[in-house]
């Protein structure tokens, strides 16, 4: 699939430090779309300076930012990755290629690099939620879709309504209900390259995310 058919949506809240390297790693021909979700730093300025399209989404929440980015995209394929540098955008082409093989949604399973400190709350939450997705929804996944690609129109038609941390989990649940073919591939996962995690960076953030997840999955 041609690169110009893909928009990479990057939801951002205060990611000025990590954005330059993240944007530089996006595959040639892919379009970068940064959604500034109430940043108090120079996220929007840095993104524009490095060639990304910038969309401002004032409604707080990860799901709000992702949805705004998908709406603003004009390509047939959309990809979503975190903007903190923890994942390698170079993994995206292999995910996109699975769409041509019949997949409806392709997600990344994080494989930590050697020596990475992955907070135990985040690890346990991921294990529990992915187990629930496998046993209750028959999805062949071991992670909660931190990196993902899908066809834009089909994604919008799926009607995901969560605008907080539960967005990716609801996406998977709705994909299962719709009979989508979901494929999960390994992707590299390293330390964030700047800033502070909005989820695992604090106990409060982790607990809020887990509650959002459980609300979707229960």
Swiss-Prot record:
GO MF entry, a single one: glycosyltransferase activity
Keywords, comma-separated and alphabetical: Glycosyltransferase, Transferase
Matches recorded under Gene3D superfamilies: Spore Coat Polysaccharide Biosynthesis Protein SpsA, Chain A (3.90.550.10)
Enzyme Commission number(s): 2.4.-.-
SUPFAM superfamilies reported for this sequence: Nucleotide-diphospho-sugar transferases
Top EC category: transferase
Family: Belongs to the glycosyltransferase 2 family.
Protein's name according to its UniProt entry: Uncharacterized glycosyltransferase MT0564
Lineage summary: Bacteria, Bacillati, Actinomycetota, Actinomycetes, Mycobacteriales
